[in-house]
Amino acid sequence: MIAPSPKSSEEEGQKDEEVLQGEQGDFNDNDTEPENLGHRPLLMDSEDEEEEEKRSSDSDYEQAKAKYSDMSPVYRDKSGSGPTQDINTILLTSAQLSSDVGVETPKQEFDIFGAVPFFAVCAQQPQQEKNEKSLPQHRFPATGLQQEEFDVFTKAPFSKKVNVQECHAVGPETHPKSIDIFDFTPFQPFLTSTSKSESNEDLFGLVPFEEIMGSQQQKVKQRSLQKLSSRQRRTKQDMSKSNGKRHHGTPTSKKKTLKPTYRTPERARRHKKVGRRVSQTSNEFVTISDSKENIGAAVTDGNDRGNVLQLEESLLDPFGAKPFHPPDLSWHPLHQGLNDIRADHNTVLPKQPRQNSLHGSFHSADVLTMDDFGAMPFTELVVQSITLQQSQQSQPVELDPFGAAPFPSKQ
């Protein structure tokens, strides 16, 4: 992109001339190059800028080298070398110099940019101070003071306030008042000082849980002992007050109020229904045992009523309840059409054989054996019906093996 020449700008308007003159700036119009009278191409500009940057970087490098030449003998020996100095040569020269002087460890190493490593600012001061006696003094003019001023970025010194004596503590010998590079005391000395305190606090200033719980348990024990002693005093006072009047206590005495209140309704129930209840704990069976009179009222015969009541009393289970009686089959709606034998028995007594139109009527309750629920086994029903019906009927009847209603056989 080449800017237009002043010849072409004369042909255009006056405004364009002003703009172009402002763009051209202070460049020389008497350039000998015919193609670009007003400007140079962009590629040439970039090359010139690169050369200027190289010069500026070289000057910066020389300044940094001049600064570090006071500290390190490496740069004093290699002051004539250019910016393309190799790292290996620096390390080799430093190792050679240290071996010549008789020092075991090499001096501070500088990276490509001429900066000191971050960890080497304060840690290597003790070694250098030991080596200052063996090395000539004119090579190290005030090394300790200058090393404090230089950090990684060769600007704001972090460790300005650190004394040379305190910087020894970063090495193997550490004492509780040592300060690190950032002017802070290490975390460990505070821990050792606080852990020896009486309260045994942890890192965060908190007392351990066991100590708190132990103190609380001791307090609880003391309180319980105090309560026990107060109770013993009360009982002794009560005994001394009620001495001699023990058996006839007035209704305002304390012993009646101390009794629990939940026992009184149970006692009242026990005194009211003591004749009718067998069990003291079950309240459900009171109504069942109270309904004895209702069962007996259904019986019409006066003589049978006494027998039935005696049977019921003897057959009560341990809970005071009677055996379960299923509803009579003759009263069931399914068997309403089979009521031909119901005329013999008007009422059904409990614990007596049930009227059954299928198997006939059973007259004696002693012959039949009932189970716990007032029902008879199937085999006994069949056998008893056969024997009873044979005694009633004059002619012999053949019965089917399944105990069905006896029909006269067709002989």
Curated annotation (Swiss-Prot):
TM spans (from-to): none
Organism expressing this protein natively: Homo sapiens
Protein name as catalogued: Putative BMP-2-inducible kinase-like protein
Keywords: Coiled coil
Coiled coil: 47-71
Region annotated Disordered, chain positions: 1-87, 215-280, 392-411
Compositional bias of kind Basic residues: 220-234, 243-258
Pfam families reported for this sequence: BMP2K_C
Biased composition (Basic and acidic residues): 8-18, 53-68
Highest taxon of the lineage: Eukaryota
